[in-house]
Structures are given as C-alpha cells and as structure tokens.
C-alpha cells in the first residue's frame, strides 16, 4: 500500500510531515509513503528513507489562493501532484494539510466522485467523553444542502463507522435546535422524514450541547452548521486549556497540585484532542482523500496517515459505493 502525502501544506511543513511519514512506515511494515514537495526542504528531516519516496516540486498552493483558480493554474503544486498520484494509480490514498477548498477541488477534478454522490462532504471525527468520538458530516465542504444530501451523508457515515470502527449498528443523529421531530428548518424536517424511513439506525434530532456526551456516532448537517460546530470545538478546547494553565501556574500551591495531576491532565488533553482521531475525510470521492488540520503537528499527521491506511485496508470507498447503489442497505 502506498499513500501520497503533501509535504508542503500546513503551518508545520515539511518537518512534521516527514517525521510523521517516518513513524508511519516504522509502525506499518506494509506501508510506503510518497512525500511531495521541495526536496531541499524535505531531505534535512529524512533521517530514514526506508519505503519513503520524494517527488520534487517547488510550487505550492497557499491558504490565500482561490481554490478553483489555484488548482487549474498551479498544476505542479504539491497538493495537486499528491492527488494526481491517486488518479494515476501510484497511490491508494492522499493527505494534505493545505487549503481545504483547493483539496476538495483537486479531489473532484482528479479523483472524481462516487457515482450517485452529488456533493462530497468533509467529515472529521470529534471527541466524546467515552473516547469513541463522533463523525460530523458535513463540516464545511458545502454551505447548503438538500434533505437528500443529508441522507447520503448518513449512508456514507454509516459505511465508514462500520468498516473502520467495526461498529455493528452506528447511531445517526440529525443536528437540530431541539430533540422533537417537528423542530428546525424545512431542511431538517424533510431530512428527518427521509432518515426515519431509511434502514439506518436513526435516533432522531440531536442538539449541539449533547454531542460530546456520546449520544450518537454520526451527526449529519449542512456544511454551514457543521463548520460552526467544528470551530466552536476548536475555540472551546483552546479556552479551557488556556484557563487551566492560567490557574495552575498562578501560585506555588497551584503549581505543586498541577505537578501531581500531570498524568490526569495529559489524559484529558489526549481525550479532547481530535487530531488523535485522524484528519477529516472528503467522503464521496472514489478514493480516500484526507484533509489534516492546517496546524497539524507530526502526531496529527501520523494519525491522518493511519486513518487513510485503515480506509484502504477496510475498502471503505467500495462499501460506500455499494451502500449508495442499494439505498443504504
């Protein structure tokens, strides 16, 4: 198995990506990784070249670039070449920490969408108290959606959780402002009916305040709402740890207490850190395309590689295709 990795995307490129790739091939003996980017910047961090290949390019897509224009004009950009590796059959999956819109555009243009999928969605796994996490779909690939899109997201999410997490009957919730069936917009009301009449394990509406308690395994929503949830999670996590740090360094007794509780705080941080779950899959494409967070460190990129490997191992794309053809069955 070979995974293509855009080594120039994100805030910590290429060091974090090279370190993650080395760790990945050491962890998974059957894995090969192609690093794509500026070889002069990559090589100093390549302490081990076992099953690692570098494709050199100096061109990259910036976060400020307009996605469609950048993908069409910067044909030698590291992200574009990364996605092309999948199209040309040289890689089974690809990962980038770069411009989200550009990655979606490149994925649609070169990998292509699964037959029947109108709008691929962005799907990160976010933390829950029980440690199992929940899949959020769509987290911002498409700002609006139809009821049929939300049903497709549920089918796609169901296939992912069954194959990668080995869940027999994943619980699916519809993000809404209340738990009652009649709540919400026309979109959520119609989507509720479609989900309720499907063969999926639909548990009804779920509110944002309950998501992290682990009330369901998959949450479906339009991309606007999903992105608000995602950004709220990021902001809340930063605020909580900032406040904890402030309080626990405010006095000598507080510092002593913090030292005694260091393992517990480490466990808490790991549980709340959604990078441990991998990146956000661009679900609905013909092959795994993973968007890692722009601020991903080596650990986060490693878990994105692990996630891509698991998707290939468990033939997630094939299962999604079959489920969509059979109406979710």
Curated annotation (Swiss-Prot):
Q: What InterPro entries would the database entry show?
A: FA_synthesis (IPR003664), Phospholipid_synth_PlsX-like (IPR012281)
Pathway assigned in UniProt: Lipid metabolism; phospholipid metabolism
Q: For this protein, what is the EC number? A: 2.3.1.274
Location in or out of the cell: Cytoplasm
**Record keywords:** Cytoplasm, Lipid biosynthesis, Lipid metabolism, Phospholipid biosynthesis, Phospholipid metabolism, Transferase
Origin: domain of life: Bacteria
Query: Which GO cellular component term is one of those annotated?
Result: cytoplasm
**So what does this thing catalyse?**
a fatty acyl-[ACP] + phosphate = an acyl phosphate + holo-[ACP]
Give one GO term, molecular function aspect. phosphate:acyl-[acyl carrier protein] acyltransferase activity
Description of how the protein assembles with itself and partners: Homodimer. Probably interacts with PlsY.
Extract the NCBIfam families matched here: plsX (TIGR00182)
General function of this protein: Catalyzes the reversible formation of acyl-phosphate (acyl-PO(4)) from acyl-[acyl-carrier-protein] (acyl-ACP). This enzyme utilizes acyl-ACP as fatty acyl donor, but not acyl-CoA.
Q: Which family does it belong to?
A: Belongs to the PlsX family.
State the name under which the record lists this protein.
Phosphate acyltransferase
């Amino acid at each position: 198995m070979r995974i293509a990795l855009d080594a120039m995307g994100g805030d910590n490129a290429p060091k974090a990506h090279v370190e993650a790739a080395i760790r990945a091939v050491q962890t998974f003996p059957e894995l090969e990784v192609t690093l794509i980017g500026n070889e002069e910047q990559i090589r100093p961090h390549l302490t081990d070249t076992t099953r690692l290949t570098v494709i050199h390019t100096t061109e990259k897509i910036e976060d400020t670039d307009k996605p469609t224009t950048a993908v069409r004009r910067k044909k030698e950009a590291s992200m574009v070449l990364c996605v092309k590796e999948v199209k040309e059959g040289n890689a089974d999956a690809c990962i980038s920490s770069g411009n989200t819109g550009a990655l979606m555009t490149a994925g649609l243009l070169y990998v292509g969408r699964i037959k029947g999928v109108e709008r691929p969605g962005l799907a990160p796994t976010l933390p829950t108290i029980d440690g199992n996490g929940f899949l959020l779909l769509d987290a911002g690939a498409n700002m609006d959606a139809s009821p049929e899109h939300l049903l497709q997201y549920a089918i796609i999410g169901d296939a992912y959780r069954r194959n990668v997490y080995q869940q027999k009957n994943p619980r699916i919730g519809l993000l809404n402002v209340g738990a009652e069936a009649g709540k919400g917009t026309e979109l959520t009301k119609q989507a509720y009916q479609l989900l309720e009449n499907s063969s999926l394990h639909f548990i009804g509406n779920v509110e944002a305040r309950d998501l992290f308690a682990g009330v369901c395994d998959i949450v479906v929503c339009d991309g606007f709402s999903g992105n608000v949830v995602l950004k709220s999670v990021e902001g809340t996590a930063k605020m909580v740890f900032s406040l904890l740090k402030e309080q626990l360094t405010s006095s000598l007794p507080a510092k002593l207490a913090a030292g005694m509780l260091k393992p517990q705080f480490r466990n808490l941080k790991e549980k709340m850190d959604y990078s441990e779950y991998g990146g956000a899959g661009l679900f609905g494409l013909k092959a795994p395309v993973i968007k890692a967070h722009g601020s991903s460190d080596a650990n986060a990129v490693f878990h994105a590689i692990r996630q891509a490997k698991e998707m290939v191992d468990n033939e997630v794309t094939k299962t999604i295709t079959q489920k969509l053809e059979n109406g979710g069955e």
